[in-house]
Amino acid sequence: KDKSYIKRLENLPEKERKALLYGSWDIFEGQYFNEWNRDIHTCSPFKLPQEYKRYIAMDYGLDMLAAYFIAVDEEENAYVYKEIYQSNLIISRAANAIKGRINEDITAIYAPPDMWNRRQDSGKSVAGIFAAMGLPLTKSVNDRETGWYAVKEYLQIKEGKSRLKIFTNCVNLIRTLPALTHDDKNVNDVANTPHELTHRPDALRYFCVMHRGNSRIQSVFDYNEAESLFEMTDL
């Protein structure tokens, strides 16, 4: 190889260097997660050890349910191994969509704080309805900048490895995560348009922010609300 050519490539700005020197073409101007490297951050599915703790991270709106099953090893390395991506689901059907995919012990289901807001039409919260259906949720942190930096920490590459691996069957997360751009008015935040891109990364953010620095999980569960909801017939 031409050593002088390699040296010139190494002196290029980061994005050009990644593309030309390492063949990392998942990069573009304005990209938020410029740490992204498909070869490092994705892997073919494999059987996860039973002792790994399992979590679900979700984002929900009538326009889209995005939920990810994530296994965590003893060193807090995370493996995103299962994806739910469905639109136009009412709350009960969204809960059933998740329940139908659970065949393992789940330590916690992370969700954004607004899922604890009571709806004006029914007086019930999404979290309460999920709890009544056997899916108690854990309230994540919704500070966007803190959350996105937590994702960046998981994506950081050290000695050719990162703490986050996404199974290749999670095609929508792999498609949307590297496509996110910086917000025009706040470079520390992710642009929330186009909205179609944000649901999947938001769900991942709710997981990463709860595991930054091996932070302790605090479950938030409204038992009184859940008890009153067990007798509901119209969810």
Model-derived features: where do they sit?
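ATPase catalytic-site recognition across NTP-hydrolyzing enzymes
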Residues: 1-58, 63
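Hydrophobic/aromatic-lined pockets within catalytic cores
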Residues: 10, 25-26, 74, 208, ...
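Short acidic/glycine-rich loop or secondary-structure boundary segments that cap or lie
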Residues: 29-30, 45, 64-67, 89-92, ...
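Anionic group-transfer/hydrolysis microenvironments
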Residues: 61, 114, 204
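Short beta-strand scaffold segments in enzyme catalytic cores
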Residues: 65-71, 205
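Mg2+-dependent endonuclease catalytic cores in nucleic-acid-processing enzymes, primarily RNase H-like
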Residues: 75-192, 214-215, 232-235
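Acidic, Mg2+-coordinating catalytic module of metal-dependent nucleases/exonucleases
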Residues: 194-220
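Extended acidic low-complexity intrinsically disordered regions
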Residues: 222-235
